[in-house]
Design a protein with these regions (language model features):
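Short strand-turn motif at the edge of the Rossmann-like AdoMet-binding core
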Residues: 40-42, 69
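Small-molecule kinase domains that catalyze NTP-dependent phosphoryl transfer to phosphate-bearing small molecules
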Residues: 80-124
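Short catalytic-loop micro-motif centered on adjacent basic/acidic residues
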Residues: 36-40, 109-110
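Loop/turn-to-beta-strand initiation segments
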Residues: 32-38, 63
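Short, electropositive alpha-helical surface patch
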Residues: 46-62
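Conserved phosphate-donor/acceptor-positioning beta-strand/loop module used by diverse small-molecule
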Residues: 58-77
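Conserved substrate/cofactor phosphate-moiety recognition/catalytic segment
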Residues: 1-32
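Conserved catalytic network of the ASCE P-loop NTPase/AAA+ motor domain
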Residues: 27-31, 56-60, 101-102
């Protein structure tokens, strides 16, 4: 959302300008960094092709995670954020897409029962 909402200020729709910039950022990371992390809420209908391209670029050496969190837990976590006044329940209900997996090989679900430490441990173990 930083790239799309804050830097480019574009709507989250198919073909939005942030996809091209994300591709460039990831390609730069591929050339210059040991690890590349793309984090955010990405709708399959909009971003699936982008992630397929990135999977191809990295020759399948990717880890994909889906936070499988209920709407109620999402609201709870949102209420604890600094930005919790920017939008509320009404907007979140409109945006909510349960089980919107990217559908990439090896995509893993992270449940709301996992602690932050458990998630970090799992990701670190996966990239070793």
């Amino acid at each position: 959302d930083v790239v799309r909402r804050e830097m480019l200020r574009v709507k989250d729709k198919t073909g939005n300008l942030s996809i091209a910039l994300l591709k460039q950022l990831v390609a730069f990371g591929y050339q210059e960094c040991q690890y590349v992390i793309v984090e955010g809420i990405f709708q399959k209908a909009i971003y699936h092709s982008f992630f397929q391209e990135m999977n191809h670029l990295f020759e399948g050496n990717v880890q994909v995670y889906y936070f499988d969190i209920s709407f109620e837990e999402t609201l709870k976590r949102h209420s604890q954020r600094n930005k919790n006044q920017e939008f509320g329940v009404v907007e979140m209900k409109r945006w909510w897409l349960p089980e919107d997996y990217l559908g990439l090989a090896g995509e893993q679900r992270l449940s709301e029962q996992l602690s932050e430490k458990q998630i970090i441990r799992q990701i670190l173990a996966d990239i070793q």
